[in-house]
Amino acid sequence: MFVFIWWPDYADPVSWFQSLLHSEDQIVYNLSYLNDPELDAIIDDAIAKTVTDRAAAEADYVEAQKIVADNAYLLNLYDQMHTFVINNAIQGVTENPAYSNAVQYYNVTTK
């Protein structure tokens, strides 16, 4: 058992499933050394469909998530919340959905 902070490379389920749960010859973030051929096949199938058939890929991700939950492969103890204080004189500040505690400032303007 271990605790660590990890953020996805990009805002897509494949970043979570591939990095944390897919078995590989070279282990990177699958630190539990999980080796589930059924889960690997579903992840691979979802990756292949992500661009061409998003709905089918989403169904694969739902199935993969069910396998992960049913087998208790991961246990999320908590999710850290972040608070941002933004001056009323500015607008356009948005949070990055893939990275908590990262704010996107490229659209910031004054009111």
Outline where the language-model segments fall.
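Periplasmic binding protein-like
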Residues: 1-25, 60
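Bilobed periplasmic-binding protein-like "clamshell/Venus-flytrap" ligand-binding domains
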Residues: 2, 52-88
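Hydrophobic alpha-helical scaffolding
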Residues: 7, 29-32, 54
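Alpha-helical protein-protein interaction elements
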Residues: 8-9, 53, 70, 97-98
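Extracellular/periplasmic catalytic domains that process cell-envelope and extracellular macromolecules
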Residues: 11, 37, 68-70
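Short, solvent-exposed loop/beta-turn-alpha elements that line the ligand-binding surface or hinge
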Residues: 15-45, 49, 79-111
